[in-house]
A protein has these predicted regions:
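Glycine-rich phosphate-binding loops that contact phosphosugars or nucleotide phosphates
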Residues: 9-128, 133-141
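A short, well-structured juxtamembrane/interface segment
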Residues: 1-10
């Protein structure tokens, strides 16, 4: 967690990606970072992610929220990271994602929800994670 906080502080630009249900979590982190003076671009769709690909550089950080850590979104991010040599953080609830080995930061959160009601039960877990991450950022910035 501390390494992710340090990466956020040292990144030239930060992109936070979350689509569909993960968008809420991505938006929460963006607003929390803004309150601490750290600007971040929120990406909520595939078209936006494709457009941002032209701007991403080696000193940038892409933070991806994805409960399943599988699918088209992560493949697109993976291609960007490979091409642009930027850094990637994956926040997920899937400990067995194929993207584990290619992420600079791979954080697995506990999954509380049932398949029928996972969104309402899992969002509080991610919210607590966001608050802990902000706490680490505060500690680092105060040094």
């Amino acid at each position: 967690m501390r390494r992710l906080a340090e990466s956020i502080i040292h990144a030239r630009r930060i992109y936070i990606v979350g689509v569909i249900n993960s968008f809420v979590s991505a938006m929460q982190l963006r607003h929390a970072l803004l309150m601490y003076g750290i600007d971040a671009t929120l990406i909520s769709g595939y078209d936006e992610l494709h457009a941002v690909d032209m701007c991403v550089g080696s000193d940038d950080l892409i933070i991806v929220y994805s409960v399943s850590a599988n699918g088209k979104l992560l493949k697109m991010v993976e291609d960007m990271v490979e091409q642009d040599q930027c850094h990637k953080a994956l926040i997920t609830m899937n400990p067995f994602s194929s993207f584990k080995d290619t992420s600079d930061h791979y954080i697995v959160l506990p999954k509380a929800g049932t398949p029928q009601n996972s969104l309402l039960q899992d969002i509080p877990i991610v919210s607590v994670f966001n608050e802990i991450l902000i706490s680490y950022l505060t500690q680092i910035k105060e040094r």
